[in-house]
A protein has these predicted regions:
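ATP-dependent adenylate-forming carboxylate-activation enzymes
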Residues: 1-11, 17, 36-40, 220-225
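Gly/Ser/Thr-rich phosphate-binding loop
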Residues: 14-17, 29-139, 152, 235-236
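Short secondary-structure boundary segments
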Residues: 20
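Short, charged/polar, Gly/Pro-enriched secondary-structure boundary elements
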Residues: 139-140, 256-261
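Conserved ATP-binding/catalytic segment of the ANL
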Residues: 147-214
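Adenylate-forming
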Residues: 168, 183, 201-230, 259-267
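C-terminal boundary motif of the adenylate-forming
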Residues: 193, 232-258
């Protein structure tokens, strides 16, 4: 794990699958280097990413990208994106996937702004791995995609994600009780909370056991909020609490090296 980012750069893969933690680490690496960069490099980065975000947002909304933005994005690719992607080991990436845990939309949008074709997948071992995935041209930064062929996905009354397909397992070995809890009438109960949006995309909220509820009954996902907070290069860790309380509270650990450099510059 310590050399994963270095290994990716050496290999230069065309297809990559990695957990959100690795992609988040790459994002943080870029943000820290941005803070250490010269004034001119920071301005080039800011301009390139600003244009990249505009193009990515239009593509997310399935709207045409104006010719002038395509031209500017091409210039940004030559001046900034190409070198940055090479540094991250993503210069040859055609398809990048992530899954296994929630990924913050900020990180997801960041890679699409760099023209990295990152897609999310959702599934579990009991359904042979993948049941839902983003398709090219149908990517939304806050979802995990749509079901693969011959797979049905529904949401129960209490918000749990359930799936049915020919690849659903028959049960746990010598554990009939657990099998009965997980498999009901051919439907696989995931233990995850979520919903299906108007475009048929699945939105995963969090593990049911990890979802907390405010005193007024409103649910929230601590992991989702923690991931959003840690998108900042100044925050190394975040811990969100608020179950049965009137409001949500976040306890944060700052990144001393990054904050220290910022403080020196602001003297």
């Amino acid at each position: 794990p310590e050399t994963a980012q270095e290994n990716i750069r050496e290999i230069g893969p065309h297809v990559m699958f990695a957990p959100p933690r690795l992609y988040e680490g790459l994002t943080r690496q870029v943000q820290v280097k941005y803070i250490d960069a010269t004034w001119i490099k920071r301005k080039i980065y800011e301009l390139g990413t600003r244009i990249g975000y505009k193009v990515a947002n239009l593509e997310f909304e399935k709207e045409p990208v104006p010719a002038h933005l395509k031209l500017l994005n091409g210039i940004g690719h030559l001046l900034m994106q190409k070198k940055l992607k090479d540094h991250l080991g993503m210069s040859r990436i055609r398809h990048a996937y992530t899954g296994g845990a929630a990924m913050g939309p900020d990180h997801f949008r960041f890679f699409h702004a760099l023209d990295v074709n990152l897609k999310q997948i959702y599934g579990q071992t009991e359904i042979a791995g993948i049941s839902v995935v983003h398709r090219d041209g149908d990517v939304k930064f806050d979802t995990v995609g749509t079901p693969i062929p011959e797979t049905e996905v529904k949401i129960t009354e209490d918000g749990e994600i359930i799936s049915k397909s020919p690849s659903v397992f028959l049960g746990y070995y010598k554990n009939e009780e657990a099998s009965k809890e997980t498999l009901v009438d051919g439907w696989l109960y995931s233990g995850d909370k979520g919903f299906i949006d108007e475009d048929g995309h699945l939105v995963v909220f969090d593990r049911s056991k990890d979802v907390m509820t405010l005193s007024d009954g409103r649910p929230f996902s601590p992991q989702y909020l923690e991931t959003r907070l840690k998108f900042s290069p100044y925050i190394s860790e975040a811990w969100v609490i608020g179950d049965k309380r009137d409001y949500v509270t976040a306890v944060m650990c700052i990144d001393y090296s990054v904050v220290g450099k910022w403080a020196d510059e602001k003297k």
